Amino acid sequence: MNSVGRRNNRRRNGPRRARRVSAVRRMVVVQPNRAGPKRRARRRTRGGGANLISGPAGRTEVFVFSVNDLKANSSGTIKFGPDLSQCPALSGGILKSYHRYKITNVKVEFKSHASASTVGAMFIELDTSCSQSALGSYINSFTISKSATKTFTAQQIDGKEFRESTVNQFYMLYKANGSTSDTAGQFIITIRVANMTPK
């Protein structure tokens, strides 16, 4: 009789052990749900980074244009801004799409097409007041018979602050001192323009 009682005790204990095991299994099922909020948090982080990229400063673009058929006695004025007729992509394009802009860098390449016997120099001057009508300084120059490049920074062209897209930033005046109308060459000009506040 006592041995039968022991077997019955084992049977009663059996289901209790099974319930303990099943309880552990239910805890395991809950664990994958804990990773859910972490994945959502990572997605929010990526979204925040993308919002920081698109700000009110707009975009920066590089434009390249040329001034052709320069002669050994040529002179003229290039107006950098909405009156830059030599670069319609800027004056008639991007500046009509933004309220404010600034030119931060200018590279002026004089590409000579003159013969080795052509005498003279091509002088250029930057006018940030946009008021000069004639060359007043002969510091920056190119030899007509040789190709060369000059680069001007934002400080030299008044390009540190944004301005209205209806206002020119600076002029570049040029004048060759040759005595003939022989072919001199061309300017190839590269400018970097930052735009702000789309229209």
Swiss-Prot record:
Other notes: The N-terminal region like those of many plant virus capsid proteins is highly basic. It has been suggested that these regions may be involved in protein-RNA interaction.
Residue ranges with Basic residues bias: 7-21, 36-46
Chain segments carrying region Disordered: 1-21, 33-52
Keywords (A to Z) from UniProt: Capsid protein, T=3 icosahedral capsid protein, Virion
Chief subcellular location: virion
Function: Major capsid protein.
Subcellular location: Virion
Organism: Barley yellow dwarf virus (isolate MAV)
Family label: Belongs to the luteoviruses capsid protein family.
Highest taxon above the source species: Viruses
Single Gene Ontology MF annotation: structural molecule activity
Keyword Transmembrane appears in the UniProt entry: no
This protein's GO CC annotations: T=3 icosahedral viral capsid
Pfam families in UniProt: Luteo_coat
Coiled coil: none
Protein name in the entry: Major capsid protein
